Amino acid sequence: MSVDVLWAGWRMGYIKKASAKGRVLGPCLFCAKARLKPGKRNLVVARTPRVLAMLNLYPYNVGHMMIATRRHTPSLADLTRDEALEVTEWLGRVEAALTREYEPHGFNIGINLGRVAGAGVLGHLHWHVVPRWDGDTNFMPVTANTKVLPESLDRTYERVVGALAAVDRRFGTRARR
C-alpha cells in the first residue's frame, strides 16, 4: 500500500520560528480574535459566549475554517461540558454551511495538541474544518511553494456568513455576526 503525502511548504518556516522562541508567535491569536466583533477584516465569522468561528488566514483549501473556544485552554480535558457541546455543535454547523455553499466531496476536521503535533497556536484549543474535493491537490505547493485558491478570502467570508445564516434555523440559535 502506498502512502500519499500532504505537504505545506510554508508551514516548516512558521514552526521553526515558533520553536526557536519556545512559545507562540506573539499574543494568543484566538484570545485576541475573541475580543473583536465579527468582520471581514479580522476573518471572524461568528462568536458566542463560548465559541469563536473564523476563516483561516493561510487556508489549505477554500472554506478552511477554525472553531476555537473563547476561553484560553490547552487541553480537551479542561473543557467544560457546555464548551464541549457547543464546539461540537459548531463543527456540525460549519460542516452544514460549507456543504450547502461549496458542495465538497468530504472534510478533514481535526485538532493538533502541542507543538510536536503540528499546532501553530500553542495553548489554545482550536479545530480545523477543511473542505475537500476529488483532485484538490496539484503540483503548485510542491514545485512553487504556492497554494492556488479559486476565490479571495473576502468572497469566502461573504459566502460562509450567508451559508451560516441559512443553516441557523436548523440549529435553533444565532451567533453574533
Please report, for each region that a protein language model flagged, where it lies by residue.
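HIT superfamily nucleotide-processing domains
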Residues: M1-R177
